[in-house]
Amino acid sequence: MGKAAVTVLMPVYNAEPFLNEAIDSILNQTFTDFEFIIINDGSSDRSEEIIKGYADSRIKYYKNEHNLKLIATLNKGFDLAGGKYIARMDADDISLPTRLEQQFELMEKNPEIGLCGTWYESFKDGEILGQVRYGPDHSTICFKHLFQIHLSHGTGMFRTSVLREHGLYFNPDFSHAEDYELWSRISAVTKLANIQQVLYRVRHHENEISKKYGDIQAANSYRVKEKLFNLIGIQVTREEMDLFQSIAYHKYEHSDKFLDGATVLLEKMLRAKGYEMFFSKSFYETMLAEYWFNLHYNTTPHSGLSAFNKFHASPLSSLKPVALSTNAKFILKGLLKR
């Protein structure tokens, strides 16, 4: 019997309350050519009993005699995987029935893609809390990675050959942001994509990582952002990283200090030399131009015509032409300063 096309990799640590649902969601996939590697990371609850209760031959069960933690267990799973692709699965989440099929088909049709995610919905106690819809293409994902993770770990499907060719593993120095950090490295050697459909469900509960280790996760996420800025050739402070996130989310402070800081940062980004490893010049400059315009246009009612003048004084304003009608509205907003 040949190797399976996909390895589904699921670490388990004391996941008893949710484990059956997680396992069933994989075994009931429309795509069936997979091996299901389940690694019990030293659980002290009934997790092992639940796993061993399944007779499906696709399940390959491994047990860590001691709790190695998530990153070491995932890296062990990378080495054990025999599939052309490796799909991640968390032991408290749910994969919707066509998830593997759709990701496999996308990866097969697009050999340049080495990591594929999907949209997901979050839920708690049976109630849907909302959906997370990430951008579809490599450039969008990489640009947004400068201020937030933009591909969900649990939904990820890797091209195994890319991982092995470049020696890519999760980095234990970035605990609780290990996915974000790996994305920063894998995106420099292959393309990323997100399927524009909800194919995964993320469960929220009292023991989830973001609640228990939020401070560590935040600190290590800052380190990843700093690393990404460095890769495109920019040295930034934590304050500048926060400023860029505010600009991206249209959370503007109506002050000269905010505008001046944004000007320094965005013009610094315009002068960057290393961004072409992630996206084209036209994409990068268009994104900066849109941020530059939105920043000034939306702060004009508070800053008056000075915002309009500052907008046109920067080389950023020439990256994307502004229609005459829009310029007229821009001036009018400035004249109607509150």
Q: What is the predicted function of each stretch?
A:
Residues T98-G130:
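Conserved donor NDP-sugar-binding/catalytic core segment of glycosyltransferases
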Residues R46-S47, L74, S95-L100, E112, ...:
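Acidic donor-diphosphate engagement hotspot in glycosyltransferases and nucleotidyltransferases
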